[in-house]
């Protein structure tokens, strides 16, 4: 949503969520369509189909789970990851984020702190068309991904979590490394 390209704070996020259309409401063990309403209508007791009852915490949690933004605020911060891809790809996204978030955040911050907000937004909007060839701050996304991938890898190595197969989490990044090395995304393979 355009809102997320502006200066966002918690109040704006809360306003966005309560004014977001309801997908459905759970009521007395059944799902009721919420298509005609926004969550604020629910808060104001204006939904006759459910006896004008007010929402509870579970209703809010359900509503938040139907809003598909890049990040969602729940009892934790949920980052949208890669989807519509194979197993290796599905595991790469969370591993990448884990390595960044649990690694050297200062190194990642130093890298991105000088980036221009409008150029980031422009790259975000261009990426669906241009993929990794999208320009950001004078370099393509292949470059930035490879730099961030190295930061992530260092973070996973320092966590040193060993799985059942005896590997640490860095092996989940193999899929992303292959994409960067070959400069071929899943979309490139399909075309």
Residue ranges of each PLM-predicted region?
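C-terminal accessory/tail domains of diverse enzymes
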Residues: 1-191
């Amino acid at each position: 949503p355009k809102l997320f390209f502006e200066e966002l704070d918690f109040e704006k996020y809360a306003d966005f969520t309560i004014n977001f259309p309801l997908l459905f409401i759970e009521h007395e063990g059944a799902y009721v369509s919420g298509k005609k309403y926004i969550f604020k209508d629910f808060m104001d007791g204006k939904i006759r189909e459910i006896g004008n009852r007010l929402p509870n915490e579970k209703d809010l949690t359900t509503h938040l789970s139907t809003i598909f933004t890049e990040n969602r605020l729940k009892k934790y911060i949920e980052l949208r990851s890669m989807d519509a891809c194979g197993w290796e790809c599905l595991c790469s996204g969370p591993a990448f984020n884990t390595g960044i978030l649990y690694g050297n955040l200062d190194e990642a911050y130093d890298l991105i702190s000088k980036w221009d907000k409008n150029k980031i937004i422009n790259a975000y909007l261009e990426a669906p068309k241009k993929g990794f060839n999208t320009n950001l701050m004078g370099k393509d996304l292949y470059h930035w991904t490879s730099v961030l991938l190295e930061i992530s890898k260092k973070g996973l190595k320092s966590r040193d979590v060993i799985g059942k197969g005896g590997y640490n989490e860095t092996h989940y990044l193999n899929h992303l490394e292959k994409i960067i090395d070959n400069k071929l995304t899943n979309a490139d393979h399909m075309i």
